[in-house]
UniProtKB/Swiss-Prot annotation:
One of its GO terms (biological process) is DNA-templated transcription. It is found in: Cytoplasm. One of its GO terms (cellular component) is DNA-directed RNA polymerase complex. It is an enzyme of class 2 (transferase). GO terms for molecular function: DNA binding; DNA-directed RNA polymerase activity. Its main location: cytoplasm. It comes from Methanococcus maripaludis (strain C5 / ATCC BAA-1333). It holds the Pfam family RNA_pol_Rpb1_5. Belongs to the RNA polymerase beta' chain family. It comes from the Archaea. NCBIfam families: RNA_pol_rpoA2. This is DNA-directed RNA polymerase subunit Rpo1C. Its EC number is 2.7.7.6. It catalyses: RNA(n) + a ribonucleoside 5'-triphosphate = RNA(n+1) + diphosphate.
């Protein structure tokens, strides 16, 4: 059976285009040629699809809220968990779920899962090289001691030669990095650097000390640590900190699979659709880690609502809850007096189009049997057949 024949059979089907394409590809891949068998598969797929559709008038938002909220009451309040790697902590459980729905700009424990391309993923040495290129290195991380020398009126840095070697750096590299960031005179005595300023004073030296410690030497900003872990037949990197844009530029990184738990960062770098998928994945993973199962369609409902305006918005008074069109709905959620005062001053009119506002005024809601109107001809006469 050819693709054209399948397309003709599926032409009038109620199945969505993506499902039609996947079904056609599966039938062709399995080499099914018997027409009766193909017809039966299409019929069964259509029946299964129709069974998954929502009944008209179903309160999908309420059901989604219940389905996520009820298992949420069983989630632990534990903030940290060892994610298979003893050295790294990530936020899980209820605190992580709150972070996701609040659309926090920065998670409490940002982390990345970095996959390597075919050339690097099977070789430990190459994976280690990529990790070194990613891990952020500053002056403090390659020094044994950084302190103010009161006698010589300078900042003294004692470099650790082993740390320099392991990170692929030399003393001249450190000197060059310091000079590019600060105007200082540097005296070099093997692994000891003396940094002098024009008008030395204890206050001036102490003010510069934290800046000297933080000078970036190598790697990706914000990536404090990178752990290498072998899973099945490939090496995967786990990072403490997140900077997906710069990590994508590192040689050896597979940009098609690498991800981060920072949803706002995904939105900024990869777009709103990627952020939507990340919300669904992160919520599902957080619930799954606690042994809880929630139908993905409930999670998709939340993700769609958060991303509907093209930017990730929190669910709460500072996001979706505070932007409802209805004044009464906004007032019923939080900050009741503030919303009612504001609406009164501006002369707003509530159209009573939603659920909450109709319940407040005692009208039937447009849900379930309330969303159906009975239409009848006014000229109908008793005894006359319709």
């Amino acid at each position: 059976m050819q693709m054209a024949d399948l397309e003709k059979k599926l032409e009038n089907s109620v199945l969505p285009p993506l499902l039609k394409r996947e079904l056609s590809e599966k039938i062709l891949k399995d080499g099914l040629s018997e027409e009766y068998l193909v017809d039966e598969i299409i019929s069964e797929t259509t029946r299964a699809y129709e069974r998954t559709l929502v009944e008209p008038g179903e309160a999908v938002g309420v059901v989604a809220a219940q389905s996520i909220g009820e298992p949420g009451t069983q989630m632990t309040m534990r903030t940290f968990h060892y994610a298979g790697v003893a050295e790294l902590n990530v936020t899980l459980g209820l605190p992580r779920m709150i972070e996701i729905v609040d659309a926090r700009k920065e998670p409490s424990t940002p982390t990345m899962t970095i996959y390597l391309n075919d050339e690097f993923k099977g070789d430990r040495e190459k994976a280690s090289m990529v990790a070194k290129n990613i891990e952020s290195t500053n002056v403090e991380s390659v020094s044994e001691d950084i302190s103010v020398d009161l006698v010589n009126e300078c900042i003294t840095i004692i470099l650790n030669s082993q740390q320099l070697e392991s990170r692929g750096l030399t003393v001249p590299d450190v000197i060059e990095a310091i000079k590019s960031k600060m105007k200082l005179k540097i005296d070099d005595h093997e692994n000891v650097l003396n940094l002098k300023i024009k008008t030395p004073s204890l206050k001036a030296l102490r003010k510069r000390l934290p800046k000297v410690r933080a000078i970036h030497l190598k790697g990706v900003q914000n990536i404090k640590r990178v752990i290498i872990r072998k899973e099945v037949d490939e090496y995967i990197l786990y990072s403490e900190g997140s900077n997906i844009k710069e990590v994508f530029d590192i040689e050896g990184v597979d940009t098609t699979k690498t991800t981060t738990n920072n949803i706002v960062e995904i939105q900024d770098v990869l777009g709103i659709e990627a952020a939507r998928n990340a919300i669904i994945y992160e919520m599902d993973a957080t619930l799954g880690n606690q042994g809880l199962t929630v139908d993905k369609r409930h999670l998709m409902m939340v993700a769609d609502l958060m991303c509907t305006d093209g930017v990730v918005k929190p669910i709460g008074r500072h996001g979706i809850g505070g932007e409802k069109a209805s004044v009464l709905a906004r007032a019923a959620f939080e900050e009741t007096v503030k919303h009612l005062y504001s609406a009164s001053m501006r002369g707003y009119v509530d159209e009573l189009g939603g659920v909450v506002e109709n319940i407040i005024v005692g009208k039937p809601i447009a849900m379930g049997t309330g969303c159906i109107d009975i239409c009848i001809d006014k000229t109908y006469e008793e005894g006359k057949e319709l």
